[in-house]
Design a protein with these regions (language model features):
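Flavin-dependent oxidoreductase catalytic cores
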Residues: 1-318
Length: 318
């Protein structure tokens, strides 16, 4: 069996393969964060195409989300998310719980304890909607991502300095304590911002350990931060940094990085760089990518024998 299509245990959940739909920002939600038929249809297409795990687009944990952003900040939104879960069935869904980024001046003094409760309540709603688990979003352009970064977090209280990941860990711990062991709790973290004043790999090694100790049984590792995110020049360009985190933790790790080629994805998994591969553009362009990837692996193109050039094949000028 190809590793890309082998099952994997994520705590209490076993997924059928290693293909994950990267959380898209579809902008298809209605005002107030409600789902729409177009939103449900997109998840239904990805599930039918054969992905092993679906990550929702970011779901706001607090009221008044940005226009087009889905939400999970109120009990009335449980039924909305349940429509997405039903559309994707039987493919498991993880709800990506997110707090949008805050203005930098506000970030330095805003109270953070209420945000922990907002995440925990949103996680409860996700489970009530039928989700297999949640992903706590610490990616760039999020409040938790800001707090984890030294370039944006200059707080001098218990959430600054060496404790920049405290809120993210407190959120994971609160969800685990409240909802118990039968829920997948993932944590998304920026492993390196690729800039001198940003998050570094050495810091992220510590953060990864802290998140797992708090109760995370899945890590979603991303590299770079807006607006310094480099343009990917080759498949799997993020994998060396992802592998550095995977070697330190005992939970599965998701990798991103323009991995739209099935053979390259299979090779990365076999090398141990990651446990799951997240796809964004390939699935947006072709929801049936998993099916075609399996066909590609089963029927690799024939090797072409190299022909040694002879003098007669060279241009006459030579």
């Amino acid at each position: 069996m190809f590793r890309l299509f082998s099952p994997l245990a994520l705590g209490p959940l076993t997924v059928r393969n290693r293909i994950v739909s990267a959380p898209p920002s579809l902008g298809l939600a209605a005002s107030g964060g409600f789902s729409t038929p177009a939103l449900c249809q997109r998840y239904e297409e990805w599930a039918a195409g054969g992905v092993g795990l679906l990550l929702t687009e970011p779901l706001a944990v607090s009221p008044s989300p940005p226009e087009g952003m889905a939400g999970l900040y109120d009990d009335s939104l449980i039924a909305e998310l349940a429509r997405v879960v039903t559309a994707a069935a039987p493919t498991p869904v993880l709800a990506l719980l997110s707090a949008p980024a805050a203005p930098l001046m506000e970030l330095q003094s805003m109270p953070l304890e209420p945000i922990q409760e907002q995440f925990a309540l949103a996680a409860w709603r996700a489970r009530a909607a039928g989700c297999a688990g949640v992903m706590v979003d610490g990616g760039d352009d999020t409040l938790l991502g800001q707090l984890c970064s030294p370039r944006s977090n200059v707080r001098v209280d218990d959430y600054g300095g060496t404790q920049r990941t405290r809120l993210a860990c407190d959120i994971v711990e609160a969800i685990r304590r409240w909802l118990g062991p039968d829920l997948v709790i993932g944590a998304r973290l920026v492993v390196d911002e690729l800039r001198p004043d940003g998050i570094t790999l050495n810091e992220s090694r510590v953060s990864a350990h802290q998140l797992v100790s708090a109760g995370a049984n899945l890590l979603d590792v991303v590299v770079g931060a807006h607006p310094t995110q480099p343009i990917a020049q080759f498949p799997g360009w993020q994998f060396p940094l992802v592998a550095a985190i995977r070697s330190l933790v005992d939970v599965p790790v998701i990798a991103h990085g323009s991995m739209g080629d099935a053979e390259a994805a299979e090779h990365a998994l076999n090398e141990g760089s990651a446990d799951l591969i997240a796809l964004a553009a390939p699935l947006l362009e072709n929801p049936a990518w998993p099916q075609q990837a399996l066909e590609q692996l089963q029927n690799p193109p024939p090797l072409v024998d190299a022909v040694r050039p002879t003098r007669s094949m060279l241009p006459s000028a030579l």
